[in-house]
Amino acid sequence: MSRIVLVLALLLPGAAAAETRPLPVPPAVPDRPAPAPMTEPPAQTPGTVTGRPLPRFASLRASEINLRAGPGTRFPVEWTYTRAGLPVEIVREFDTWRRIRDMDGVEGWVQQARLAPRRTFLVRGGAATLRRAPDEGAAAVAELAPGVIGTIRRCEAASAWCEVSVAGARGFLRREAMWGVYPGEEVR
């Protein structure tokens, strides 16, 4: 059986196979270590604007999105995200602005129109194996490199596995290998 190794360069539009450049990483936030993987779903409260639960996951709609210090264009840009589909957590709402948090714990404000409800994930830690069935003994479909982004198709609340797709490959990935879904969360 052949294994496909998906690398970040293959997922970026226009990236040459022979030329792989690391993506910029947001600056480290002093006095705030990167969050540890969650073991329980967070307590949720209704958003003040939409009434939808907070926190909740969304994804970046465009390949260039400014993260601002506050909810408005008068606030300075602190960072520019350059990866469409990147999963983020919406942690607060104000008018048409959403305070988001990325996998590294960096927070800031973006316009709601720059976010999509599409559920995506980011492979965290080391390489992760995409399996044909939700079982460690199932055949491998692909090896996913750290930082690869994919789409969450569904997650059963009681399952340690989620059905996902990445660059045309479809299979099952353990929740602990991805960032973009809460422990015990059901995604349909």
Residue ranges and their predicted role:
Residues T73:
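A short, aromatic/hydrophobic, helix- or strand-capping loop or linear motif
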Residues S2-L6, T129:
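N-terminal low-complexity, intrinsically disordered tails enriched in Ser/Pro/Gly
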Residues P76-V77:
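Beta-strand-rich domains and repeat architectures in extracellular enzymes and scaffolds
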Residues A16-T20:
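Boundary at the C-terminal end of the N-terminal hydrophobic targeting segment
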Residues R21-A69, T80-A84, V91-F94, R101-P134, ...:
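SH3-family beta-barrel domains
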Residues V5-P13:
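Bacterial N-terminal signal peptides
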